[in-house]
């Protein structure tokens, strides 16, 4: 006789683990609460359910990540991480607490109403954390640079007005201009910019270290072929390809590009009824890192679809099956972008539409590798 399944919903926080255990095809379960230690919780459940049961745990995807999943599976129990945004909600249910959350998870899990998420390997998770840290450092550096430019404007130092052109900030020319301004500045301003410059240089050094490590990782066997498939796209270099690969994971789990579009939050919100159609902005209910990289890569939609010097260099020794998909993508988003632009669509909307198109081709390229 097979063991009965015990469905266990977990609500996890820093202070307590709340659990609700319910036997399959039964209506009443039992609540548990323990200190934040999964082994203590499992011990409590086993003391209550002394018969032989197969434990099926589930919990929402939260800040706890995959650590709890690996702790549970390590001791021989099954565990599923649930997509929090896809948990069914009742409009009349206005009471929420940890105990009820755990109960709802257990009941919905037993009825098969929950959607599991993809679990990466430990190596993929660690590499993704490294890549995200590099993005975090880069964002920090941008904020400090913006702060420095704001201070200059408060002091009446306007670089673009002085140079009589729309020059970019933080070029060598801009740095030389700033040094000249600081010669006659007060001691407080000199001290302020000395610290700011040290911060910017320190973050630049950290960025270089991260990027060197990412380039080294890109040569590993599990990433090398995927990198080749992506760097033949215009607008995607090795660093951008590493971000896409680590964030997308195994693309075979997406049976159609539309599902990948939803995962990236590039779907268009729609509220249509009867003969009336209402479409709004993109949902943004998905991976922001993928959206950002693709939008940046799609900036070149209005350029003539030709293979430039840098792209030709990146495409050396890459199989034709990858370059063929990338070329189709380049021509497609150029045609699509021009069409939307001539219709008078806002530039940012055009870029987003091109990014959505591009994601479908990337799905095809990565599936060529995995298949």
Predicted regions and their residues:
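Short glycine-rich, Thr/Ser-proximal phosphate-binding strand/loop in the N-terminal lobe
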Residues: 13-40
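Basic, amphipathic alpha-helical segments enriched in Lys/Arg and hydrophobic/aromatic residues
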Residues: 335-338, 342-371
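Phosphate-backbone recognition surface of nucleic-acid-processing proteins
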Residues: 229-232, 238, 242-343
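Short alpha-helix plus adjacent loop in nuclease-associated cores
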Residues: 81-118, 276-284
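Short, basic/hydrophobic alpha-helical segments
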Residues: 38-56
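Glycine-rich, often acidic, oxyanion-interacting loops/wings at catalytic, nucleic-acid
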Residues: 135-227
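Gly/Thr-rich phosphate-binding beta-strand-loop-beta motif of the actin/hexokinase/Hsp70
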Residues: 2-23, 105
């Amino acid at each position: 006789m097979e063991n009965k399944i015990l469905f266990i919903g977990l609500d996890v926080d820093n202070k307590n683990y709340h659990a609700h255990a319910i036997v399959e095809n039964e209506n009443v379960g039992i609540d548990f609460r323990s200190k934040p230690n999964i082994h203590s919780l499992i011990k409590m459940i086993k003391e209550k359910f002394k018969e032989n049961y197969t434990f099926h745990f589930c919990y929402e995807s939260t800040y706890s990540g995959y650590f709890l999943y690996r702790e549970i599976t390590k001791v021989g129990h099954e565990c599923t991480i649930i997509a929090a945004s896809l948990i069914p909600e009742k409009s009349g249910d206005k009471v929420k607490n940890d105990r009820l959350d755990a109960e709802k998870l257990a009941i919905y899990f037993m009825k098969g109403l929950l959607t599991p998420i993809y679990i990466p390997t430990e190596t993929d998770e660690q590499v993704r954390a490294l890549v995200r840290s590099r993005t975090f450092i880069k964002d920090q550096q941008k904020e400090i640079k913006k702060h420095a430019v704001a201070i200059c404007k408060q002091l009446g130092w306007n670089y673009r007005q002085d140079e009589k052109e729309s020059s970019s900030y933080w070029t060598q020319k801009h740095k030389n201009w700033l040094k000249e301004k600081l010669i006659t500045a007060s001691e407080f301003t000199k001290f302020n910019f000395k610290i700011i410059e040290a911060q910017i240089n320190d973050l630049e050094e950290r960025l270089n270290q991260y990027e060197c490590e990412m380039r080294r990782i890109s040569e590993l066997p599990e990433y090398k072929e995927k990198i080749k498939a992506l760097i033949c796209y215009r607008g995607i270099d090795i660093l951008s390809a590493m971000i896409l690969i680590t964030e997308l994971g195994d693309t075979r789990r997406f049976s159609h590009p539309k599902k990948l579009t939803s995962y990236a939050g590039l779907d268009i919100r729609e509220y249509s009824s009867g003969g009336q159609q209402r479409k709004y902005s993109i949902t943004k209910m998905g991976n922001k890192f993928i959206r950002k990289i693709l939008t940046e890569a799609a900036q070149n939609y209005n350029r003539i679809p030709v293979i430039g010097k840098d792209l030709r260099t990146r495409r050396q020794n890459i199989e034709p099956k990858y370059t063929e998909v990338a070329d189709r993508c380049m021509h497609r988003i150029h045609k699509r972008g021009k069409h939307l632009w001539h219709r008078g669509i806002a530039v940012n909307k055009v870029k987003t539409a091109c990014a959505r198109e591009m994601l479908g081709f990337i799905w095809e390229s990565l599936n060529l590798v995995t298949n």
